[in-house]
Amino acid sequence: MKRAMGTSEAPRTLRTTLPARAYTDGAWFAIEMDRVLARMWLAAGRVDQLDHAGAFIRRDVAGASVLIVRAGDGSIRAHHNVCRHRGTRLSVEERGTFQGSIQCPYHAWTYGLDGRLLAAQLGDLPSRFAPWAMQDLRLAHRIEYDVATNWKLVVQNYNECLHCPVIHPLLNRMHHYLGAENVPPAETYCGGAMGFKDGVETLSTDGKRRREFLPGLRGRDREVVNYFAIYPNFLLTLHPDYMMTITIWPRDCGRTTLVAEWHFHPDEMKKKDFVCADAIDFWDRTNREDWAISEQSYLGISSRGYQPGPYSERERQLWEFDQFVLARVNQSP
């Protein structure tokens, strides 16, 4: 009987415990975190722990810190506990209640309970721009450009006027190309004001102003144009009598859509003799000059003969923008 039983059974596989390194080796642990816990649903808590809007619990696992939040619409959301700005943790508490929004303790970037970015710190820009009352201005004209260049070259071109005497004969008649009064560098924007040459009143095809000053402007604000690049994709140009903006939409590394919009005060737009073609034509011409040279820059950079060149002292804002991009490209996901 024993011999018969022995011949009818297959040899058993010896089952053993895991090797010691499965419990003690940091590299093994890291693989478990990445391939097991980070890729599967985890038991994080009970729904009744989040019994009101803004209630949250924090869970730290597999190299991530996650905020699980009851949103205003009653849904439950999970957000990385990381600010998009500089990576600061949004909350160090294990549980609590957000009062309507989630605000980073570092630079006050503010998010909705649903995770949407609601506000980003722009330093003193809101107070600086308050006299223009941009919220009161109304859109009069819009032009969309399809430009064969990298989006960063558009920002860099906007941030200096050393090219103005060569590329922009009309603009160069309005400003002195070395006349920029730049504000101190900031992390999320750069820019400043440029005064007019004698006899120039605004940026138009002939330098004449055909509209009243914007109501909130006084003194020096009536005598300059403010140029600000607000990172990453907004170019704001404020004149004594109107506002021109450019929104940058990268499509691929060598193609960018640029949307230019001209805004005026509604009281001016209601007038029977209201005109805006002088401002639109001025900037459409100037913009196209910029887009053409930006396309040529991209072609040159795409050549195998390209090597990075030095910035001059008057191109510091371009370097600052480069650092803004590099800091985010090089940060950990």
Regions found by a protein language model. Name each.
Residues E32, V82-C83, V154, D290:
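Short hydrophobic core segments
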Residues R70, S75, L118-P333:
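C-terminal catalytic domain of Rieske-type non-heme iron oxygenases
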Residues E32, A64-V66, S332:
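Soluble FAD-dependent oxygen oxidases
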Residues K2-A20, Q135:
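Short, contiguous pre-domain boundary segments
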Residues T16-L18, A22-V61:
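Non-catalytic accessory segments flanking enzyme active sites
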Residues M1-A10, S127, N330-P333:
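Basic/polar N-terminal segments that are highly enriched at the extreme N-terminus
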Residues Q49-S127:
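Rieske [2Fe-2S] iron-sulfur-binding domain
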